[in-house]
Structure formats: structure tokens, C-alpha cells
A protein has these predicted regions:
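Hydrophobic alpha-helical transmembrane segments in multi-pass integral membrane proteins
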Residues: 93-105, 143-159
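Hydrophobic, membrane-inserted alpha-helices
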Residues: 37-47, 62-68, 85-93, 141-150
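Short helix-perturbing small/polar motifs within transmembrane alpha-helices
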Residues: 86-124
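Hydrophobic transmembrane alpha-helices
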Residues: 10-56
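Cytoplasmic-side transmembrane-helix entry/capping segments in multi-pass membrane proteins
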Residues: 77-88, 103-110, 129-138
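C-terminal ends of transmembrane helices
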Residues: 64-75, 116-126, 174-175, 179
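Short, highly charged, low-complexity non-transmembrane loops/tails of multi-pass membrane proteins
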Residues: 178-196
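Hydrophobic core segments of alpha-helical transmembrane domains in multi-pass membrane proteins
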Residues: 56-65, 103-113, 158-169
Length: 196
């Protein structure tokens, strides 16, 4: 769905100004990511509001997205599957129990998992220099520490929840789960007929 919109928009931009724009595939990739993020964020805002936890939902989402950028992770091939999966995972994590001891445990587990497993990139993804990845990993660890400080000062647990979600997805079990989900979402349908 998003891919079709991205292709259509990239086609229009290339028709308007073919000389001064990025290559078509770069435009499609960028627009697909943009549409995916907007859809996911809008969906989470709406559902968070409906279930009565809009601020908590935004906290979890922002923390998850920041760490995802810093630490990578397994990916789904279809952007709509990515949006739906991300939304379901975030909405599951807003229901985690809250207490000072539990939040400290979530924080410690997140810190340990990110220190151990980050970064993760799929084989087809571009890997940056080791120095750059170490800087991103340090930034991720600082972010996790910052999430606990936010919880401690402002009683906002969602940032810790988002960190835990991303940390769990970096584990071998989390990566295996996403890969199995990707295989499931790719079976049958128009998309697989075109690519297979």
C-alpha cells in the first residue's frame, strides 16, 4: 500500500523536475519510510486516545523509535506489516505493570540487552564504520539511562517501556520472532506473486 503511494509520488516528482531530484529508487524508499512512520504514529495516537492512554502511548512510541534508529533490528519486508506489528507491540507494552521495583528491573534488563546485542542489521543493510556504531551504541545506552531518569523525576514510565521493547527485539529470540512474522506476512497475495 505505502509502496504504491511512494512510487506514484516519486513518479510525479520525477516528471516535474527530473534533473534536480534524487534517483527514483531513493525517492520511493524515502517516501515509503515517511508514509510508514506517519501512518504508524497516527494509528498509535488514535488507538492510545481510544483506550485512554494517549500520552503513555506517545512515550513508548518515541522511546522505541529513538532506540530503533540507534540500534537497528530485524525488519519486515512489507511496510504495512511493519506498521501493524509496531503498533500492536507498542500497545501491548503500554499495559506493563508499573511499580518502582519493576521499572528498575525493566531499566536494567534494557541496559543489559542493548549492551549485549546492539546493533543488529539485516544482511542487506548498510553497515557503518565500527567507530560510528560504537558512538550510536553509547548514545543508545545513554538514552536508556535517560528513560529511567525521566521515569524517576516525572513518573513517566512509557519511555522505559519503549526501551525494553526495542531491547527485547534485539535479542536472538526477538530477531527470530520478526523473521518468522515476516515469512508469515509474505505468504500468498499479490505482493508475493510479483516478487516470486
Amino acid at each position: 500500500m505505502f509502496e504504491k503511494w511512494a512510487v506514484a509520488l516519486a513518479d510525479q516528482i520525477k516528471k516535474i523536475n527530473p534533473e534536480e531530484t534524487e534517483p527514483h529508487d531513493v525517492l520511493v524508499f524515502g517516501f515509503t519510510i515517511l508514509f510508514n512512520l506517519l501512518f504508524t504514529f497516527l494509528l498509535l495516537l488514535i488507538v492510545g486516545w481510544i483506550i485512554g492512554v494517549p500520552l503513555l502511548t506517545v512515550e513508548v512510541t518515541l522511546s522505541f523509535m529513538i532506540l530503533r534508529i540507534l540500534t537497528g533490528g530485524a525488519h519486515l519486508d512489507r511496510s504495512i506489516a511493519c506498521s501493524i506489528t509496531s503498533s500492536l507491540l507498542v500497545l501491548t507494552f503500554v499495559w506493563l505493570p508499573v511499580s518502582p521495583i519493576l521499572l528498575f528491573c525493566y531499566f536494567v534488563v534494557s541496559l543489559m540487552l542493548i549492551a549485549r546485542f546492539a546493533p543488529y542489521y539485516e544482511p542487506h543493510q548498510i553497515k557503518h564504520s565500527k567507530q560510528w556504531e560504537q558512538k550510536k551504541k553509547r548514545a543508545a545506552i545513554l538514552w536508556v539511562i535517560f528513560t529511567f531518569v525521566i521515569y524517576y523525576i516525572f513518573s513517566a514510565p512509557g519511555f522505559v517501556f519503549g526501551a525494553l521493547l526495542q531491547a527485547l527485539l534485539l535479542t536472538p529470540a526477538g530477531i527470530k520472532f520478526i523473521h518468522k512474522l515476516n515469512n508469515f506476512t509474505m505468504k500468498g497475495g499479490e505482493y508475493c506473486e510479483k516478487s516470486g
